[in-house]
Design a protein with these regions (language model features):
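Glycine-rich phosphate-binding loops of nucleotide-dependent enzymes
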Residues: 1-235
Length: 235
C-alpha cells in the first residue's frame, strides 16, 4: 500500500533522513519508534507532503506521491494527526469534527462518519456541544483522531498520540487506535512510548539519527534483549 524507498530529507543544510526505506501493507498497524530527534516526525511530514524529500521515493497504491501536495495526498486517503493535537480550542467538538469532513462532499457519508467516530469515542458524543479547549489532554487527543477520521481516510499517520497523557488516558487512546486498525484502517504510529506502541502493532521499525536500524514483527522485537534494554526498560 505504501512504500518508502531510500528517502533523504534536509532541514536547511542539515540532513535529517538518510536513505530510509519502509513499507506498510493494507490493514497493517506499524510502529515507528526512536528517541527524540531520530527523524520520526519528519518521516510522517514527508509522507503527508508537508516536507519535501531531496531524493528517494514515496509510492502509495502504485502512484508516486513524492512531490504531491498536502491536499492531493489527503484526497488520496492519507491523513496525519500531528503531535500536539492542534484542535480548534474555541470551537465545539461537533464543529471541529465537521471541519475534518471537508474532503467528504456526500452529506450522507458525513453523517455515517460522524456516527462512527461518536461510537468509537463515546465521550465526544456526550460533550459534542462543549468547546474543545475545555477537554482534558486525552479527550483532545481523541478529538484530533476523530477529526481525522471524518474524511474517511484509508491510512492514518499518528504522531505521538500519548504525549502528555496520563497512563489511563494513554490506555484509552491506544485501545481506540487498535480498534480503528481492527476495523480496517491502515496506521503508521510514531511513538516514544515504545512498549505500548509495539504491543498493539503488527510490525515495528526502529529509527536512530535518521536511519532505520532494526525492523521486524513487533512480538519478536519485544523479546530481543538489546531492544528490551534500549527501549522497553528491560534488564
Amino acid at each position: 500500500m505504501l512504500q518508502i524507498k531510500e528517502l533523504c530529507v534536509k532541514y536547511d543544510n542539515i540532513q535529517v533522513l538518510h536513505g530510509i526505506s519502509l513499507e506498510l501493507q493494507e490493514g497493517e498497524l506499524v510502529a515507528l519508534i526512536g528517541a527524540n530527534g531520530a527523524g520520526k516526525t519528519t518521516t510522517l511530514s514527508t509522507i503527508s507532503g508537508v516536507k519535501r524529500a531531496f531524493s528517494g521515493q514515496i509510492v502509495y497504491d502504485g502512484t508516486d506521491i513524492t512531490k504531491a501536495g498536502t491536499d492531493e495526498i489527503v484526497k488520496m486517503g492519507i491523513v496525519q494527526v500531528p503531535e500536539g493535537r492542534q484542535i480548534f480550542s474555541k470551537m465545539t467538538i461537533e464543529e471541529n469534527l465537521i471541519l475534518g469532513a471537508y474532503t467528504e462532499k456526500d452529506s450522507q457519508r458525513q453523517k455515517q462518519n460522524m456516527k462512527r467516530v461518536m461510537e468509537l469515542f463515546p465521550i465526544l458524543r456526550e460533550r459534542r456541544r462543549q468547546t474543545a479547549g475545555t477537554l482534558s489532554g486525552g479527550e483532545q487527543q481523541m478529538l484530533a483522531i476523530a477529526r481525522a477520521l471524518m474524511g474517511n481516510p484509508r491510512m492514518l499517520l499518528l504522531d505521538e498520540p500519548s504525549m502528555g497523557l496520563s497512563p489511563l488516558m494513554t490506555e484509552q487512546v491506544f485501545d481506540a487506535v487498535k480498534s480503528l486498525n481492527d476495523q480496517g484502517t491502515t496506521i503508521l504510529l510514531v511513538e516514544q512510548n515504545a512498549y505500548d506502541a509495539m504491543e498493539i502493532s503488527h510490525r515495528t521499525y526502529i529509527m536512530e539519527n535518521g536511519v532505520i536500524t532494526r525492523e521486524g514483527k513487533s512480538s519478536e522485537l519485544m523479546r530481543d534483549p538489546a531492544i528490551k534494554q534500549a527501549y522497553l526498560g528491560g534488564d
